[in-house]
Structure formats: C-alpha cells, structure tokens
Amino acid sequence: MLTVGDKFPEFELTACVSLEKGQEFETINHKTYEGKWKIVFAWPKDFTFVCPTEIAAFGKLNEEFADRDAQVLGFSGDSEFVHHAWRKDHDDLRDLPFPMMADSRHELMRDLGIEGEDGFAKRAVFIVDQNNEIQFSMVTAGSVGRNPKEVLRVLDALQTDELCPCNWTKGENTLDPVALLAGE
C-alpha cells in the first residue's frame, strides 16, 4: 500500500457527479484538482451497509473540507452506472456533493496497493497535498467504518506545518520544540 511520502498515482476515471439528466457523469483525473489538497477514499462495493454511512458522513463534511482547499473524491470498483443507481436508490447519497469515481478496471486500487484478495477495494483513505504527495494513509477492516471528522482533524494538523500533539484540534496550541527543550 502506498503511504506517506509516496506520489499519488496518475489516474483517469469516470465519476457519477449528479442525478440530473445529462449532467450525471464526468471524467476525473489526477490533474482535475491540481494545486488542491485531496481526500481520496475507497469503499469495497456499492449497495452495502457500512459504505453509505461513511460516504454520507464525508458528504456532510464536504464544505469543511472545501474551506480548507481540499477536494473529496470517493471510489470503488463499481461502474459509474452502478454508482448512479445507488445514489438514486439511497436517500443519504442522492445529493452527494463530491464525485463517486468508478475504478471498474481496478487500476487505481491496484496502483495504491489497496485491492483485497477478494478483488474489492480495501476501506482506505488518503490525504494528498497540493504537490500530489501522500501525507496520510489509513485502512480499516471491511467491517469498520472510518471517521471523516478524524480525517478533517488530520488535514487541519497537516496544514499547520507545525508539531501537533495527540488529539490536537484546530485552534489549539501546537508544540514549540525550542520552548520544550528549554523546559518552558
């Protein structure tokens, strides 16, 4: 699995971006959001149980990610048509404010090293900086949903470019190593 310091792979995927007729799909690639932070997360498959809770939670925080100049991008190995059908079918996904990318050939999940032995994407999330370098990566067991608020907290910490202690949140003091070494 790619990790901190690795370049995020190049990709080009079709995404479901809307339920509005004629506006449903867009092509998204590694340059689409160039110069922005990116929150890229994968889920195993559509029409399941844990996945929509995470996707909806990332959607509810989308504005907060956008306020930090970060674009949320989600994907699975399902096609854009399956994503569209799921969005249409699931109340919590209808108005999703970010693209649901279709990695139907499994190229991105393979390049990231998150394709499971079962052929499905592992439940992974990556924070990618403006230079397309991975600054955070996490994967959980398929039965355990991620916490998008924690991903937002880590993004905040990364954007300070300072030392942030355990459980640090935006607005709190960061660590001053000079003062700490001086015993202050």
Model-predicted segments: where are they?
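Chalcogenol-based redox active-site neighborhoods
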Residues: 1-184
